[in-house]
UniProtKB/Swiss-Prot annotation:
Organism: Formosa agariphila (strain DSM 15362 / KCTC 12365 / LMG 23005 / KMM 3901 / M-2Alg 35-1)
Similarity remark: Belongs to the SusD family.
PROSITE patterns the UniProt entry points to: PROKAR_LIPOPROTEIN
Function recorded in the entry: Polysaccharide-binding protein probably involved in ulvan degradation. Ulvan is the main polysaccharide component of the Ulvales (green seaweed) cell wall. It is composed of disaccharide building blocks comprising 3-sulfated rhamnose (Rha3S) linked to D-glucuronic acid (GlcA), L-iduronic acid (IduA), or D-xylose (Xyl). The SusD-like protein may mediate ulvan oligomer-binding before transport in the periplasm for further degradation.
Pfam families: SusD-like_3, SusD_RagB
Lipid addition sites, N-palmitoyl cysteine: C16
Keyword annotations: Cell outer membrane, Lipoprotein, Membrane, Palmitate, Signal
Protein name: SusD-like protein P25
Localization per Swiss-Prot or TrEMBL: Cell outer membrane
Membrane topology: Lipid-anchor
Keyword Membrane set for record: yes
Amino acid sequence: MKIQNIIVYVFLIFSCFSCEEFLEEDPRALIAPETFYQSESDVRQAVVGLYSILKNNSIYGQLGLDLFYDNGADIIEPNRSTNVVEPLGNYSLNEAIADVSVQKMSVSDTWKDLYRVIYNANIILDNVDGNDAISEEAQIDIMAEVKFIRALCYWHIVNLWGDAPFYTEPLVLEEIRVLGRTDEDTILSTVVSDLQYAQVHLASVYPEEDRGRASKWAAAIVEAKIHMQEQNWQAGLNKCMEIISQSPHSLLGNYADVFNPNNEYNSEIIWSLDFAKDIRGQFEEGTLGADGSFPSVFGNGNWRPSMFAPRLRDEPKNSSERNALAAALQANGEAFNGTGLQVASKDFAGKFPRNDYRRALNIVDNYLGFDLNFPYMAKIWNLDVDNSPRFNHSDNRIVFRLADVYLMAAECENELNGPANAFQYINKVRERAFATQTEWELKGLDQQGFREAIYDERKWELAGECHRRYDLIRWGILLDVVQDLEYRFWTPNTNIRPYHVKLPIPLQELQVNPVLLESDATNNGYR
């Protein structure tokens, strides 16, 4: 059973402000925390409100984090020029463009919503600790969950902006307006501390009705990733091995089964955000029809599968067969009614090994016997018209899964000791991807050769799952990779600059708070 998107009072207030409104109003003056947090139920609702913000288009909903973690690299590009993807995909981003919101997606939207989660999390923590209306056991459980969510948001902020405003106590907005940027190492130190608290106190597994909640293993994988960012390979390996050996998670035998929408809580998935159809929320205002229904374009479930699904007007390759394709889809209860804005890049499609079973889920260039113009990622689309309509999907959003951890363990072991004991981890992932051991077994590589094998294996295994650009940046090879590629519509290979490894702080944030420029007048190189 999915956790329903409960739109609680606190979430409604904190999420309905524009940036300017958010900085002009003090939400705590509208609903005082001391009057809201009167029971464990009240607090649990507030925590669900944090998850609700994470599901916004700016973060895990449509293309929020995808814009920054997958676009502008070597796996994904759009099937046409579009202003949704262009600033990151073509590296034309600047401070002003960072403020331009398209369907609640922009650098600014992501910045605001990550900090909304943090703002709310600080208030929840302040009102739970020592609250006599809540049992001590519930207090600890709630604080662990909220600390994980806050840590996750700060981790994303550091990944995207580096040094950033940082606070862990409730502040009035006048105080927030004058915060400068804290060194990212200082932020990550607190993040790791919060993640370790979460691992001690969060559950390892949840009952069916709570399976959308983050477990201790979600906190563990983020900690492992931070250790790897810092090249603390032993700590990273230790944490990966803890997940592999102690968690209830296991790799599935079939890669395709990982992404089956009818088995969204399978054993490989460490954490996924659950979505439901027909939930009102961030697109409600100004979009409801007279009968209270949503226009079809503004469904408020998970938008993301629609971004990976084809548009019928773009397909098939032989346009004279379009009606026949539509009829074949209809007979299957399907439709090409997506946007096609996230398809496999030319380089990715051209290099994906043809004997790799994963190719069929990542490179779909023929469907129902019709050759297609573009290669699509079927692992993320859902063409089911009745149960997963356009922009209103109930599909969960996979955030972390165990195959990632095996590849992380392989990387850590190789960096520490060379590849001798690392092959077992990468081959564990590859084994299900090929027909024979001769095909899947890697052996005989030196340390650099194994390092390059990891570069490729993470690409094939985790394509479209918000890892690639982050990986290329932490490996220090983003510029080299992008400059060496040919793209369909744009020229990111000539536009990219060294400073593009970080985002600019949006211009409107700088105008409200000039202190943000005191430690770096260049705004991450964009000035």
